[in-house]
Amino acid sequence: RTVQVMISGAKHIPPQPYLVPKEMENLFIWYNENKDKLHPVELSAEMHERLVTIHPFIDGNGRTSRLLMNLILLQNGFPIAILKGDTESRLKYYSALESAQTENKKQPFLQLIGDNVKETMERIINISEK
């Protein structure tokens, strides 16, 4: 992106446009350094959080970060994380994301993604048992 963006209702302010290319380069350096060290669920959640924090696009950052997260999960044999769209689930998601972005408290976000992957796995098991 070439303009500064703000996220409505969020405390996090994305980096200035001139910083985005370097931030994106750093993101993929981090990915290459950690892809074989972290559990795939943790890796996918970290990439989601890091990409949406950089906010490299004017629009579609959340969708793109969820696609990237789910690609990493699928590449590693896990089901996609289905993030529910109801009000309570969205508030939990935004709260956990904001803690990661503004306080560097990543555990709530990692747990949220892990719980969603687990729920998807349980649904698949329940369907296959029927």
Task: Give residue ranges: language-model regions.
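FIC/Doc superfamily catalytic core
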Residues: 1-130
